A protein has these predicted regions:
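A beta-rich soluble binding module of mature secreted/lumenal proteins
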Residues: 1-220
């Protein structure tokens, strides 16, 4: 989806990670348009070392759980391939519930075999590159006191498999570094490209074994 033209390089707008517990909205934040997030997003850059060292073809598919008053509860289907198992696709399925008082922020609760894993997730920036391809910066962090899961990360995702152009990526990084949040700057400084290949096969669908996380990405 490339229909929404947004911030140019000179006007990349960012926000620090919101306070998920207090639910205090950053007044300068411009929410994404209704239904804008739905569909497939290719993760092209991530600060999560586990991902850029060990995986490729990381995709997140968002869809509404049901039609209703916006913001809706969404389903999230993650798929990726381990570098060590290039013929395999692993998945993780979860339900994203909006965080009260915040735009573009959710509590992601995994299901089935991964029901013990939850994260807070939020969009920290969004827009379109010079080719009018939509991109978004995703932030995810474990819940306070969590003993399982991966540490906090930022990631750039795009509607196109190979991501926003290099000038857009640099503009995004510069905007976050200029925001003055030291913890966020450390994550942004650790952003690395994530391998995306031009695949002909389709993505996984939400069949029963996928929803139950029977063959989840935590098992490789």
């Amino acid at each position: 989806m490339t229909s929404h033209r947004s911030q140019s390089k000179a006007t990349v707008q960012v926000r620090p990670p919101p306070s998920f517990i207090e639910g205090v909205q950053d007044k300068s934040w411009t929410p994404t348009p209704e239904n804008w997030l739905y569909g497939s997003w290719y993760m092209t850059h991530t600060s999560q070392q586990y991902y850029w060292e060990r995986t490729k073809n990381f995709v997140i598919q968002y869809a509404p759980v049901m039609n209703g008053v916006w913001p809706c509860t969404n389903q999230e289907l993650v798929s990726l391939t381990p570098l060590s198992q290039p013929e395999r696709i692993y998945t993780a399925f979860g339900i994203d519930s909006p965080v009260a008082g915040l735009d573009d922020a959710w509590l992601c609760q995994c299901t089935g075999h991964l029901s013990h894993i939850s994260d807070h997730v939020a969009f920290l920036a969004w827009g379109a590159d010079s080719k009018n391809v939509d991109w978004v910066v995703l932030y995810s962090t474990p819940l306070p006191g969590a003993t399982v899961g991966l540490p906090a990360q930022v990631a750039i995702m795009s509607r196109e498999r190979f991501g926003p152009d290099n000038s857009m990526v640099e503009a995004i990084k510069e905007a976050f570094c200029a925001a003055g949040d030291s913890d966020l700057t450390k994550l942004v400084d650790n952003l690395r490209p994530l391998l995306q290949e031009d695949l002909e096969s389709g993505r996984p669908t939400c069949e029963y074994h996928v929803v139950q996380n029977v063959d989840s990405l935590t098992r490789f």
